[in-house]
Amino acid sequence: FLFSADAEPSLVNRKIMGSTPVKKANELNSIKEVEDVANKISGDLNKIGINYNFSPVVDMSPNKTVGYRSFGKNPENIIPWSNQFIQSTQANNIIATAKHFPGHGLVSGDTHKSLQVINGPLKEIKNYPPLIENGVLSIMVAHIAIENNENYSTQGLPSTCSKKVVTELLRDTLGFKGLIVTDAMNMGGVANVPKNASKAIAAGCDILLMPADARSAHSELLQLYLSNENEIQSSMNASVKRIIRMKICLGLL
């Protein structure tokens, strides 16, 4: 199985009892510290059987919800420090996850509570291509709508439920071939979207994180698969293959 955790430097000591004390992401002062923290966290995760870390946060820092969780105190550090965290994590046979695509750092509010909006250009997208090129294995998509953007407006839906963002931008334009996971599906930014499970999977996400009702989501996805045309079935089959390949690479199968 894939066992996951939000083991970010800024959250791990609160989330995992007995974990090795580490500095929060915004308190780190060098790329060497980033490497050391990633290795300490990964060592703890390996001891308890967690092989999928929803970290690092690669957003910019202005947003209060994610700012202290990212390396964005100095914008020039975001890409190299995130890459170091990713490489150190994956060297420990743990999947690393860059988040929150397409960018949570410059929106004003909290997607845990409600849908947030990027108005206009996607200024944080630039953080992702270098991480993709360097082999990050997973990317988490945020519950953020996009407005006034000619190519990627989401028509009021969160990015998690938008094929334009997940498939056309992340898969096709940026060329990401790894696992795409939603942010938690019980969050305020998506919970009130009707049939959000099937919308997220139809958009191209591979994994639904924490649906509010897992049984209902499973039934919804089964119905989606059985009642839709070949394009949806092909996309869902491809997601299953990506997950199986990842398990094989981790030595789980």
Q: PLM features: residue spans?
A:
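Hydrophobic face of alpha-helices
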Residues: 38, 82, 218, 237-240
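Mid-to-C-terminal alpha-helical segments outside catalytic/metal-binding sites
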Residues: 211, 225-253
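Glycine-rich, aromatic-flanked loop segments that form ligand/cofactor-binding clefts
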Residues: 1-20, 37-59, 78-102
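Short glycine/serine-rich loop/turn segments
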Residues: 52-72, 96-115
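Second-shell residues forming the walls of enzyme active-site clefts
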Residues: 80-231
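Glycine-rich anion/phosphate-binding loops
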Residues: 28-43, 75-80, 120-122
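A charged helix-plus-loop insertion that forms the helical arch/lid used to bind
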Residues: 19-31
